């Protein structure tokens, strides 16, 4: 990584794992897309190429990624629905060349060496942390650095630097009246199916007691 598509119009950086990438790959191959490796990154990249931002509705996994869409001159980034993989961002009015920009990464320390990153303590983030002993807000201890919430995506218009953040998934907590035994059977089925989906790997899978 970074990985680009065939004409170089899309470039992706990706951290995580897409559990259903093989199904996505088969669907995309049927549409004429060519694959050059067995990585889930390529399925994600071509998925965006085909479905745009709606690719998020098809993903199953843990992920944080950003795609540079050169044709639309924008960035598109997203985080998985449970927030397993982190994604931090730092909007800049001046990225050093007089134009706006944004830093992004899975760790804040990747920002530290950038010459136009302003290192300052965010005092507003200290109070909730001292109270709850974990960071409960989108703000971080660095002023101006934020974490993208779970189940959210952002777009950045590169010429203007305008950033838009949207939620793409939410849980439905509506109660459904069913016999207790039916709930047990459904839960058992979901757990087994989830474990099976997580077993996809390039090496043998083991479990530690």
Q: What role is predicted for each listed range?
A:
Residues 1-209:
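Cysteine-centered catalytic environments shared across enzyme families
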């Amino acid at each position: 990584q970074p990985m680009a598509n065939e004409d170089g119009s899309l470039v992706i950086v990706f951290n995580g794992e897409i559990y259903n990438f093989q199904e996505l790959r088969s669907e995309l191959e049927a549409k004429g897309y060519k694959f050059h490796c067995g990585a889930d990154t390529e399925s994600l990249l071509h998925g965006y190429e085909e479905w745009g931002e709606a690719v998020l509705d098809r993903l199953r996994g843990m992920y944080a990624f950003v795609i540079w869409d050169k044709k639309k001159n924008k960035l598109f980034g997203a985080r998985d629905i449970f927030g397993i993989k982190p994604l931090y961002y730092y909007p800049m009015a001046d990225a050093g060349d007089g134009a706006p920009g944004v830093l992004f990464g899975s760790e804040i320390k990747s920002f530290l060496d950038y010459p136009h990153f302003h290192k300052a303590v965010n005092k507003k983030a200290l109070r909730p942390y001292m109270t709850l002993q974990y960071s409960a807000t989108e703000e971080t201890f660095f002023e101006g650095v934020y974490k993208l919430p779970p189940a959210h995506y952002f777009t950045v218009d590169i010429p203007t630097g305008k950033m838009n953040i949207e939620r793409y998934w939410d849980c439905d907590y509506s109660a459904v009246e069913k016999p207790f035994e039916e709930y047990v059977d459904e839960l058992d089925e979901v757990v087994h199916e989830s474990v099976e989906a997580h077993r996809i790997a390039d090496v043998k899978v083991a479990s530690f007691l």
